[in-house]
């Protein structure tokens, strides 16, 4: 398993194949990810523990705020903007296509490109 440290927490890459990827994503309370989208990557996120707010682009192209709790699932389709803010320490389980470098950051608190 590969561990990838992030400014907001870390990712544990459990499986990466030519068909899919499985990651455990951990956010520290009060941190947030970049506002981002993916050109090709398609992901489903399951909230394993904690509470988070997700800014999420809906089917009409409008940004919504979703309150995510354990047991919730969110689908992030290619081209859809999204950002996670951890209200508590949060753990997601993410299943996606294997395009792990496919990240376009629109806004980023940590000045990453």
Predicted features along the sequence, with ranges:
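Glycine- and acidic-residue-biased ligand/ion/polar-headgroup-sensing regions
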Residues: 40-58
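Short acidic-glycine-tyrosine-enriched beta hairpin
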Residues: 58-79
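Double-stranded beta-helix
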Residues: 2-5, 62, 85-113
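A generic "binding-loop/recognition-motif" signal
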Residues: 31, 40-41, 80, 88, ...
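Beta-strand residues in well-ordered beta-sheet regions across diverse protein folds
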Residues: 23, 35, 47-48, 55, ...
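Conserved hydrophobic/aromatic beta-strand scaffold that supports enzyme active sites
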Residues: 22-26, 44, 65, 73-75
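Histidine-centered metal-chelating micro-motifs
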Residues: 32-34, 53, 72-83
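A short glycine-rich, His/Asp/Glu-containing loop-to-beta-strand
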Residues: 2-41
